[in-house]
């Protein structure tokens, strides 16, 4: 989990003011140019008004491009189900670099000399060496978790023997991948053997409406799969840093429903007990009295705000 990094690459810098101005434009005779010069207090008020009226179309004018680096393909496949976004993902042909690093570390520990890059000594010979090093690492009792962790994601539920078994299976799969490359199978076909746990990176562009109405409510929730929940909470922290007047109100589905049916309060207020839930139950059917505990659980599993 600690190797998953979420960073904000680019965003609409004046997004808060732009959203407030767009919201006011729909109800004003003034020109958008004049509206944009509104004081900061008015920006805050118009943003709150979009929550009160569930008027989120102005939020589409502010756009955010961010990176999820080191997550698994299990996570990225869930991520791309969000249709109102643009994605660019590292090709699986280029995740081979992390597999090769695992093979080279194993080779170094075992005293096996493997070329650092396939082209240095003929690709097939290099692939044979990588495969041999990985297989020997599994047989010889080297720490498989240490070797596999840079290349693969381990679910936190795996501990003890289960963790070691998973690591050995990851390394064995990588060894077989290199065995296929060594006999001339293309990378496009050999990659069918690589587990979904392999790390990847993906660049995502979403507008603020997609973030507050769909991605963050669904993926910050306790019911979301642990890895994409971690990505969502990390992203929320980055968004609050740059546009607090927009994203301090955002959160899991319980918070979104509460904030669109009553006077909105910041997510931190719900976490710290300064605001209470009045909805009878959340969209996941958790009753009112259990919502805050569920929210704290989601936040705790994601590393706490």
Where are the language model's segments positioned?
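Family-specific signature for flavin-dependent thymidylate synthase
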Residues: 1-305
């Amino acid at each position: 989990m600690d190797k998953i990094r979420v960073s904000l690459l680019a965003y609409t810098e004046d997004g808060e003011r732009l959203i407030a101005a767009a919201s006011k434009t729909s109800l004003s005779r003034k020109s958008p140019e004049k509206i944009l010069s509104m004081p900061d207090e008015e920006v805050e008020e118009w943003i709150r008004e979009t929550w009160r009226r569930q008027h989120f179309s102005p939020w589409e004018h502010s756009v955010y491009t961010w990176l999820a680096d080191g997550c698994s393909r299990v996570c990225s496949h869930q991520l791309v189900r969000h249709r109102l976004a643009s994605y660019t993902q590292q090709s699986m042909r280029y995740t081979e670099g992390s597999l090769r690093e695992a093979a080279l570390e194993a080779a170094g520990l075992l005293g096996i000399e493997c070329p650092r890059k396939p082209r240095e000594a003929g690709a097939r010979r290099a692939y044979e060496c990588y495969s041999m090093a990985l297989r020997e690492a599994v047989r010889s009792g080297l720490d498989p978790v240490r070797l596999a962790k840079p290349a693969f994601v381990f679910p936190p539920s795996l501990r003890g023997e289960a963790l070691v078994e998973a690591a050995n299976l990851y390394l064995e799969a990588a060894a077989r991948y290199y065995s296929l490359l060594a006999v001339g199978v293309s990378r496009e076909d050999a990659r069918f053997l690589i587990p979904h746990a392999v790390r990847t990176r993906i660049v995502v562009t979403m507008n603020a409406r997609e973030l507050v109405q769909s991605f963050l409510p669904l993926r910050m929730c306790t019911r979301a799969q642990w890895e994409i929940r971690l990505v969502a909470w990390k992203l929320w922290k980055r968004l609050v840093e740059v546009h607090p007047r927009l994203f301090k109100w955002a959160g899991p589905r319980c918070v979104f429903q509460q904030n669109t049916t009553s006077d909105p309060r910041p997510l931190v207020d719900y976490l710290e007990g300064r605001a209470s839930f009045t909805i009878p139950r959340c969209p996941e059917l958790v009753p009112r009295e259990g919502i805050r505990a569920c929210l704290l659980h989601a936040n705790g599993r994601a590393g706490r705000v």
